[in-house]
Curated annotation (Swiss-Prot):
It catalyses: chlorophyllide a + oxidized 2[4Fe-4S]-[ferredoxin] + 2 ADP + 2 phosphate = protochlorophyllide a + reduced 2[4Fe-4S]-[ferredoxin] + 2 ATP + 2 H2O. Pathway: Porphyrin-containing compound metabolism; chlorophyll biosynthesis (light-independent). This is Light-independent protochlorophyllide reductase iron-sulfur ATP-binding protein. It comes from Chara vulgaris. One of its GO terms (cellular component) is chloroplast. Mg(2+) binds at S14. Its main location: plastid. Binds 1 [4Fe-4S] cluster per dimer. Transmembrane segments: none annotated. PROSITE patterns: NIFH_FRXC_1 (PS00746), NIFH_FRXC_2 (PS00692), NIFH_FRXC_3 (PS51026).
Length: 288
């Protein structure tokens, strides 16, 4: 099974991906996480350091694939999750999609691409050009990370459009949304009401999720010394269980941009109007 994780930049894709990878491993699966971001920090909380990238390794070998060994590019992370960082071209040059293609090509050359139960692609930001949509060419499922905000849901809608486009020629389905670190889910619910898709999980606003990234540890590793965090791990285990059940998934039908803008902005405006009316009523009551 191959999974591509997308979402707005800074939404917490890598943190979520690492914890999902651990959860899948806890369910007895052999897991490989591939970071598809020039920052090459996707697997940081699994390995505790920035591992060398595929592109760096290939460059050091003058792109002689026969000189590259699995241990040159595949690193063992926490929980027996294997880790690879694709890397990227120099800033302002080249195509990230090409890098993803080279990564998959090399893993196939090493007979490593098909030996895992689950391969998870963690893809940078909300860039949905043909290049960074490349992991969708290999994926069975796409998971979109979002929060309860306007920008994240707007990005999710654009990613849903990419899934629909790729599903024309590939056996790809959207597994669903994962809400990350959000105190509310009303806007998420409003969106999925207008654009039907599964919501796999909504994680509450837990500060330790953010702290884990800074510490370079997954929530599962932190929970080993702090049992109060075990309930957070259950969220990721729930996501893993849903994925392993091989859900039917959907081919989403995204909302046109202007229609979505109106839907989400009207929702915000109505909330503000209701809040103002409530404040006025309370003020009137106090005056009386």
């Amino acid at each position: 099974m191959k999974i591509a994780v997308y979402g707005k930049g800074g939404i917490g894709k890598s943190t979520t991906s690492c914890n999902i990878s651990i959860a899948l491993a806890r369910r007895g699966k052999k897991v490989l996480q591939i970071g598809c971001d020039p920052k090459h920090d996707s697997t940081f909380t699994l390995t505790g350091f920035l591992i060398p990238t595929i592109i760096d390794t290939l460059q050091s070998k003058d792109y002689h694939y026969e000189d590259v060994w699995p241990e040159d590019v595949i690193y063992k992370g926490y929980g027996e999750v294997n880790c690879v960082e694709a890397g990227g071209p120099p800033a302002g040059a080249g195509c990230g999609g090409y890098v993803v293609g080279e990564t998959v090509k090399l893993l196939k050359e090493l007979n490593a691409f098909y030996e895992y139960d689950v391969i998870l692609f963690d893809v940078l930001g909300d860039v949905v050009c043909g290049g960074f949509a490349a992991p969708l060419n290999y994926a069975d499922y796409c998971i979109i990370i979002t929060d309860n905000g306007f920008d994240a849901l707007f990005a999710a809608n654009r990613i849903a459009a990419s899934v629909r486009e790729k599903a024309r020629t590939h056996p790809l389905r959207l597994a669903g949304l994962v809400g990350n670190r959000t105190s509310k889910r009303d806007l998420i619910d409003k969106y999925v009401e207008a654009c039907p898709m599964p919501v796999l999980e909504v994680l509450p606003l837990i500060e330790d999720i953010r702290v884990s990234r800074v510490k370079g540890k997954t929530l599962f590793e932190m929970a080993e010394t702090d049992s109060s965090l075990e309930y957070v791990c259950d969220y990721y285990l729930n996501i893993a269980d849903q994925i392993l059940s091989q859900p039917e998934g959907i081919v989403p039908k995204e909302i046109p941009d202007r229609e979505l803008f109106t839907l989400l902005s009207d929702f915000y405006l109505n909330i503000n109007i209701n809040s103002n009316n409530l404040e006025k009523n309370e003020s009137s009551f106090l005056i009386i």
